[in-house]
A protein has these predicted regions:
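Mid-chain, well-packed structural core segment of small domains
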Residues: 60-96
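Non-catalytic interface/targeting segments
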Residues: 1-62, 100-121
């Protein structure tokens, strides 16, 4: 039996993966991956956009800690990009960030590519 993973995918429209920083997505679609199957869990509104926090600089380490708290049950973050310092900080906290650079990916295709990068498909 493979270990269960909880995956957060950044999205602004509920259909496609957000093209831009993971931390500025309007919401996250949360999925569980276990025994080769993906199951949708829920949609979570992002309360930590730079605008909401009043942060002007990207890659602020405070935001990485707050993102980890907001998505504390997630093992993998899937999105277009994330600042290097934040990505390193999250990896120190046990979160794997999977960057996917193609614009317009459906959430399903983003998940498929992320699982492939994790060696799970």
């Amino acid at each position: 039996m493979k270990r269960k993973l909880r995956i957060a995918v950044a999205t602004d429209d509920g259909k496609t993966m957000r093209f831009g920083h993971f931390g500025d997505a309007l919401e996250y679609h949360i999925f569980d991956y276990e025994d080769g199957r993906l199951t949708f869990v829920e949609t979570r509104k992002n309360l930590l956009t730079d605008e909401a926090l009043g942060i002007e600089e990207h890659d602020n380490p405070m935001k990485a800690r707050m993102m980890r708290e907001q998505l504390s049950d997630c093992d993998v973050f899937v999105g277009h990009s994330m600042g290097l310092k934040n990505r390193q900080k999250l990896e120190e906290m046990g979160v794997k960030m999977i960057p996917l650079v193609k614009k317009g990916l459906s959430i399903e295709e983003a998940l498929r590519r992320a699982l492939e990068k994790l060696g799970l498909s």
